[in-house]
């Protein structure tokens, strides 16, 4: 979907609502509140798009995993991993947010992290092998980034029957909470 298509859908879904501002969790890199490249799993036209003009209110845009991380954060050093279509990631250290792009880092001799824990990997590998990969990647990144805990979110995080040690599951409304947090 293009930004125009999504904005049309949002306006239709919120018809009759009054709002003063908009928070957008964007599935890709964001710098200074602006998308840096078109997302891999959506249409073109995101870079340079005028969201303020389209919505007619102030807009803040951050990476979607970063938004969910903000709504999940419980203090200290936390790594957020979003298990959805791809692999989203963000790091929060003592309240300071650092969006990450870990998805395309190499994983063993098996492609990238995303190729082993994204939605296509779940379908290709099956739940048992996919779960093993999630546990392995969580442990690998937890050690490498020296975090106290990992938060797992995204639609496929619910597929995990158990969680790796020092891991929590992000709440369903974490992205919404993160969107509110942006305006504090």
Report the location of each language-model feature.
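Short, acidic/turn-prone active-site loops that include or flank metal/cofactor-
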Residues: 1, 85-87, 103-111, 172-181
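Glycine-rich phosphate-binding loop and adjoining helix at the ATP-binding site
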Residues: 1-11, 16-77, 116, 165-184
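Short glycine-rich, Thr/Ser-proximal phosphate-binding strand/loop in the N-terminal lobe
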Residues: 1-8, 12, 91-124
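Short beta-strand segments
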Residues: 23-27, 80-86, 153
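Glycine/Thr-rich phosphate-binding loops of Rossmann-like dinucleotide-binding domains
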Residues: 32-33, 89, 160
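Hydrophobic, well-structured mid-protein blocks that either form specific transmembrane helices
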Residues: 63-100
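A short, acidic, amphipathic alpha-helical segment used as a generic capping/interface helix at domain edges
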Residues: 130-143
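Glycine-rich phosphate-binding loops at beta-strand->alpha-helix junctions
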Residues: 141-175
């Amino acid at each position: 979907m293009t930004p125009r298509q999504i904005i049309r859908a949002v306006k239709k879904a919120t018809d009759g609502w009054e709002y003063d501002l908009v928070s957008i969790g964007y599935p890709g890199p964001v710098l200074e509140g602006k998308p840096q490249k078109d997302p891999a799993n959506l249409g073109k036209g995101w870079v340079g798009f005028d969201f303020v003009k389209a919505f007619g209110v102030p807009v803040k845009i951050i990476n979607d995993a970063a938004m969910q991380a903000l709504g999940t954060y419980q203090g200290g050093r936390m790594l957020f991993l979003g298990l959805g279509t791809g692999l989203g990631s963000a790091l929060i250290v003592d309240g300071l947010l650092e969006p990450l792009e870990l998805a395309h880092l190499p994983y063993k001799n098996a492609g990238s992290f995303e190729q082993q824990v994204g939605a296509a990997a779940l379908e290709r590998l099956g739940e048992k092998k996919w779960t093993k990969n999630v546990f392995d990647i969580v442990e690998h990144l937890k050690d490498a980034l020296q975090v106290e805990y990992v938060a797992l979110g995204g639609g496929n995080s619910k597929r995990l029957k158990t969680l790796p040690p020092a891991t929590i599951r992000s709440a369903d409304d974490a992205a919404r909470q993160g969107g509110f947090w942006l305006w504090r």
